[in-house]
């Protein structure tokens, strides 16, 4: 039973995402591009394989969805290496944006406010978005204007550093504002 499953896996699951090369190409005719980029036009697959063998290189299917498929004569090992290297570089350059949260209360002291504001600036310098939430407890929710004033103080403290994605608005018992780093400043 285990052997049977392995055979099915090998048949249906591709081990890599690289294009087909040489004898794996199933088309009868291909649009051939030479090793230096010169176009040879539509050629029989056997002729294309012969040309690749004579050059000591591989025939690689570049665009399988085209009619006929586009194939290029090149060194397949080098092609795979460069593809992996490009993919690795692209992943390295990707920046995952994280949403950090900073919670405030309406009656926050000046020292705590400045500390939290400094921490928000650190998050923004790291390139993260920040969700600033103001939690109301009990009867504090009756004084929403205190929350609005607090958010105005936050905006003044972060002026020039941020782009406001979502202005202060109520969600249940909390007031929320979302800011992200301003690209112009960085």
From Swiss-Prot:
Record carries keyword Cytoplasm: yes
Region forming the signal peptide: none
SUPFAM superfamilies: Translation initiation factor IF3, C-terminal domain (SSF55200), Translation initiation factor IF3, N-terminal domain (SSF54364)
The keyword Transcription is annotated on this UniProt entry: no
An annotated GO cellular component: membrane
Key words, A-Z: Cytoplasm, Initiation factor, Protein biosynthesis
Compartments it resides in: Cytoplasm
Pfam families, per the entry: IF3_C, IF3_N
Record-level Gene Ontology MF annotations: ribosome binding; translation initiation factor activity
InterPro entries per UniProt: T_IF-3_C_sf, T_IF-3_N_sf, Translation_initiation_fac3_CS, Translation_initiation_fac_3, Translation_initiation_fac_3_C, Translation_initiation_fac_3_N
GO BP annotations, alphabetical order: ribosome disassembly
Database matches in Gene3D superfamilies: Translation initiation factor 3 (IF-3), C-terminal domain, Translation initiation factor 3 (IF-3), N-terminal domain
PROSITE patterns: IF3
Family note: Belongs to the IF-3 family.
Free-text function comment from the UniProt entry: IF-3 binds to the 30S ribosomal subunit and shifts the equilibrium between 70S ribosomes and their 50S and 30S subunits in favor of the free subunits, thus enhancing the availability of 30S subunits on which protein synthesis initiation begins.
Subunit relationships: Monomer.
The protein's name in its UniProt record: Translation initiation factor IF-3
UniProt lineage: Bacteria, Pseudomonadati, Pseudomonadota, Alphaproteobacteria, Rickettsiales
Gene: infC
